[in-house]
Amino acid sequence: MMKIDLKWQLHKWRAITFIVLGRKAWAIETLEDMLADYPNDAYALGSLAHLYAEAGDKQASVDMYKKLVAKPDAQAFAWYNLGYLQEELKQIADAEFSFRRALELNEKLDQAWYGLGLTLIQQQRFEEAIKALKRNTQLQPMSPYAWYQLARVHMDRQQPEEAVKIIRHLKGFEPKFAAQLERETGLEVKAS
């Protein structure tokens, strides 16, 4: 029979109650107390990381995610969230590592492919970025974001014919994105 830790349960339910009531500062305080008692608790680390990010303290959130991903059972989404925040903080090489780690754990995590593509663009590693963004479009073919970034990369690489193909494709399901790309690139593309 599994033993229930009532102290841990009390911390957890207090934090949940405060979150539901909109008292996020109290929830943070409760979760910090929980970490004092249970320093490696995944629930407390993940919840604090999320609440710190919501409160605008991205570095504190990164610190919590780093502790969370250091656990042997770290999940792909924890690595993805860490990468996302690192990219926001312009920690590009660290973000790339985190996205790659997320993809090692779950190669179908489309958001991580997109994040990886963005970090590679920022490092001007365009060939790798194209591969990552294409993988995202395979997993999420109707999401315009990776298509948009692909077109931008092709324009940066002086490949307008590839950008035209993407704009034409976007006109079929996301005409606003297609129009934005036409304005930004100066290309006028007829729908096929």
Where are these regions (language model features)?
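Alpha-helical segment of the N-proximal tetratricopeptide repeat
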Residues: 7-56
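Helix-start (N-cap) detector for alpha-helical repeat units in TPR-like alpha-solenoids
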Residues: 7-8, 42-43, 76-77, 110-111, ...
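Canonical tetratricopeptide repeat
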Residues: 13, 47, 81, 115, ...
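TPR/TPR-like alpha-solenoid repeats
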Residues: 17, 51, 85, 119, ...
